[in-house]
UniProtKB/Swiss-Prot annotation:
Residues 28-356 form the Alpha-carbonic anhydrase domain. The keyword GTP-binding does not apply. Gene3D superfamilies: Alpha carbonic anhydrase. This is Putative carbonic anhydrase-like protein 1. It is found in: Secreted. Keywords: Secreted, Signal. The keyword Heme does not apply. Its main location: secreted. The gene is cah-1. It comes from Caenorhabditis elegans. The lineage of its organism: Eukaryota, Metazoa, Ecdysozoa, Nematoda, Chromadorea.
Length: 365
């Protein structure tokens, strides 16, 4: 019996022809594009350290189904700690000032001789206090609240890299479903669709949103750096914010939208002088959480996902400006970064928990 194997070298030649142009002309190693070598279907094959992408059973993202969520009273709202010495002093002074103003206002309101003050504050003392809190907490422009950051086009996505120094606050996540550990935000990743497409990674009842903002943090209580934490138990926490279309754009998203013009091509980067990452977060205490994985190679199943149950918004004209981002180098053929999301993974009977007691889903409105 005779076996003909002459087709095998031809297969190698064809495969080589497909791989080489990818690395030379596109100039990237892995991609969210399922139609190319290096796309999600190949993640678990091309690198031995990425085997979890193919065989893992706790993979992300997933579809969030509200009627299957498990209410868990032990899941507390997430706390955001951005405190350093200067910020502690600032907040201490602010609280003392608030107490002083409240006391003075109350005295003015109760003193009948001061009729004008009584008319102003007497019936509206609660509103006055709320107004002062709003001014001090949400409108105070304090340099210490800004972090050192860099906006970069990695070739697979655009990302904000957070830098740290003794004179700037660290951005930390704690409480919630994190078992008391403190996680430091290392970067903020942006997943999106093209002009007329939605590109969030997580979906709600099958609905995909235009964009998803992911604050990626590592456990500083257990691990010395992000790399070791990403491969270790309880190593990573990702705070996910879905972005929907609306009449107004979130203020920090406006800053980033303007900055995208400076990072159109792979490896381009720009410093963000006044970036405040916590302003990307909506005002909500409602969260959804589950144990999953990174959504990029090597898909390590070390992530506690925390999805906020309220979106932030972006105007369509601002969203379209993000479509001028390319995964190719400047001067090469323009290949858009978007869409850059991983497909939905199987839940595999995982518990998806929430602290929401009522059946009001802002995502579904």
């Amino acid at each position: 019996m005779r076996f003909e194997c002459s087709h095998f070298p031809l297969f190698l030649i064809i495969l080589t022809c497909h791989i080489s142009p990818l690395k030379s002309s596109q100039n990237y190693q892995w991609s969210y594009d399922s139609d190319v070598f290096g796309g999600p279907h190949f993640w678990g094959l091309v690198e031995k350290d990425w085997w979890m992408c193919k065989k893992g059973r706790l993979q992300s993202p997933i579809d969030i189904q509200p009627d299957r969520l498990l209410f868990d009273a032990s899941v507390k709202p997430v706390s955001y700690a951005e405190l350093n010495f200067f910020l502690i002093i600032y907040l201490t002074i602010s609280l003392k000032l608030m107490r002083y103003i409240f006391t003075c206002a109350h005295l003015f309101a109760c003193n009948k001789k001061l009729g004008t003050w009584n008319r102003i504050f007497g019936a509206n003392i609660a509103k006055f206090r709320a107004w002062v809190v709003y001014i001090i907490i949400f409108h105070a422009q304090v340099p210490q609240l800004q972090v050192v950051s860099e906006f970069v086009n990695t070739g697979q996505m655009v990302r904000v890299r957070i830098g740290y120094s003794s004179k700037k606050p660290s951005v930390n996540i704690t409480s919630g479903p994190l078992y008391g550990y403190r996680y430091r935000v290392q970067r903020i990743d942006f997943h999106m669709g093209r002009k007329n497409e939605n590109g969030s990674e997580h979906t709600i009842n099958g609905r995909r949103f235009p964009m998803e903002v992911q604050l990626v943090a590592y456990n500083t209580d257990l691990y010395p750096n992000f790399t070791s934490a990403s491969k270790s138990p309880h190593g990573i926490a990702i705070l996910s914010v879905l972005v929907d279309f609306g009449p107004e754009t979130n203020q920090e998203l406006i800053k980033l939208t303007i900055a995208t013009a400076s990072i159109s091509y792979k490896d381009q980067r720009v410093q963000l002088a006044d970036f405040e990452p916590w302003r990307l977060l909506p005002f909500t205490r409602d969260i959804i959480t589950y144990e999953g994985s990174l959504t990029s190679p090597g898909c390590h199943e070390t992530v506690t996902w925390i999805i906020l149950n309220q979106p932030i918004f972006i105007k369509k004209e601002h969203f379209e400006e993000w479509s001028h981002l390319y995964l190719s180098m400047e001067g090469a053929e323009k290949v858009p970064v978007a869409p850059n999301f991983r497909k939905i993974q199987e839940t595999n009977n995982r518990l998806v928990r929430t602290n929401i007691q009522h059946k009001v889903w802002i995502f579904l409105s």
